[in-house]
Structures are given as C-alpha cells and as structure tokens.
C-alpha cells in the first residue's frame, strides 16, 4: 500500500541516498535551481524543511521509503499550492508509484489542507513525468521558454472538481 507522510529528520538521509552517484543535472532536474545546490547536503535539507508555507513528504510503499514530494507556496487565501521536488528512487520508477503518490498528495492538499488548486512545473523533455502527471489528472496550462532551451518547461495544473 502506498502512503504519503510528512518527512521527519530521520528521513533526510534518504534524499542523499537517492542522489548518490548522480550528477548536477540530475539534481537540477528534480529539485530545480533555487533550494538545493550540488552536491545536496543534510544542512540544505534541514534548512529547507523549516521553511514556512512548505511541506516535504516521504512516499512509502508498504512502509518502505521510495521517494519524496513537496508542497510549497501553500496559500490559504487563494487555496492553492505548488508541487515540487518530486523524486522516486531508481527501483521505484516505471511502476505507477508516481501517479499513485500524486493522487495521495492531491487528497492531502484538498481534504486536509482545504486547497482547491495545485500547480507544478515539468521540463518539456521529461516525457515520462508529463505522462505521470496527466494520469493523475494534471493539464498543461502554459509553456515557458528559457534561454537554454534544454530547460524549457510547462506549468501543469489540477483544480478541484
């Protein structure tokens, strides 16, 4: 059974493990340019975990940690948040866990946090992630052109029905 639960300090090393042996582009792809810098460290994770309007979650498959996903920019006035820094360990990819995790996070956001809208960014080249997000009900809303076209990205959105 898949569950999405709030991260605890004992989980911080998991993020390091899932990035072990990966390069700077890998970190940039899943974490973006602002929060974590290569190489990712416990200090960076601790600092980020304490940020207001943000929540890091661990994805569990039968109590085994297989990934992490975050809600940030949680806004109780606009009833919205942004999904970001979504990572699955290598042996959990291509098994449907990403879609299941997103559906769990959507339930948390809408039922527990009282939100109505979620957004996320995804790089245009990341077809596997785009398909995962679409399976969970997200729609492409906007294209963003960057100077380095490799990092062009979409905004995707999920609204409460």
What is the role of each PLM region?
Residues 1-3:
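Extreme N-terminal starter segment of soluble prokaryotic enzymes
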Residues 6-12, 16-93, 104-108, 112-113, ...:
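Acetyl-CoA-dependent GNAT
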Residues 81, 116-130, 135-161:
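C-terminal "cap" of GNAT-fold acetyltransferases
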Residues 89-103, 123-131, 135:
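Conserved glycine-rich acetyl-CoA-binding loop
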């Amino acid at each position: 059974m898949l569950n999405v639960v709030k991260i605890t300090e004992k989980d911080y090393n998991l993020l390091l493990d899932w990035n072990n042996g990966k390069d700077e582009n890998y970190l940039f792809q899943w974490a973006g340019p602002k929060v974590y810098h290569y190489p990712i460290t416990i200090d960076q994770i601790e600092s980020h975990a304490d940020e207001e309007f943000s929540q890091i979650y661990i994805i569990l498959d039968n109590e085994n940690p297989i990934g992490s996903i975050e809600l940030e920019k949680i806004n109780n006035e606009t009833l919205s948040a942004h999904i970001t820094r979504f990572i699955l360990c290598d042996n959990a990819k291509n098994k449907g866990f990403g879609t299941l995790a997103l559906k769990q996070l959507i339930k948390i956001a809408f039922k527990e946090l009282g939100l109505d809208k979620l957004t996320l960014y995804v790089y245009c080249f990341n077809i596997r992630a785009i398909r995962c997000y679409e399976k969970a009900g997200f729609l492409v809303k906007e294209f963003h052109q960057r100077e380095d076209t490799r990092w062009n990205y979409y905004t995707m959105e999920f609204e409460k029905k």
